Amino acid sequence: MEGSMNRDFEFKQLLRAYRSGIINDATFETEMKNLEHGASNGNGAGFTAFGKTYATEREAGIKFLEAVAPAETAGGEAIRMWLSTCKLDCITGGLKMVAERESYHGRAFAQRLTELGGTVPSASAELRESIAYLCDANMSDLEKLHTAATKFPNPDETIRPLFEFAEQLKEDQQTKEMIKLFAQDELSTLKWQNSLCAVLIEMKKNGQLAAAA
């Protein structure tokens, strides 16, 4: 019963996107086939991702996009705020690349969510609070980098669930490939920040870095 209600909701989302011109005939037809395929192959067990169980793969994908699209956009905005005050060239260079990545991730995922009939929510207060330190003018650049690095000390383990989720997706090949590339970008960012942080901390210990850095 619950699965049927979820499919009805997903169909209405698709129909709304189609009627409003957000998706074309081909996309609508493809997504309808995916929805029907998910219904015909359902075994009652649901689709499990990130420790939660969803009625369908489609529902899991939409929930993922709803969470990630605003988070990436907010991350890009916060990093640009940091860039406006950053004093270390090595950090500035990396931040420029990361800011662009975050922003285009947000745009691409928002577009995909809209194509699926979803609506992009605003970034939550909890999310904005968790990245507020990036905009804190009272923190040094190294302190900010160190804070970011300590949040994710093991990049491979942090990003592994994203790769696993992408591999689970069988029906939505568009979202699958987007998530795979997103995960590679995120892994690159985490490895960059952790590696650079270690180098700068060592330089500071040896007196090779200004105290204000």
Put a short name on every predicted segment:
Residues M1-S4:
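Short, Lys/Arg-enriched N-terminal segments with co-localized hydrophobic residues
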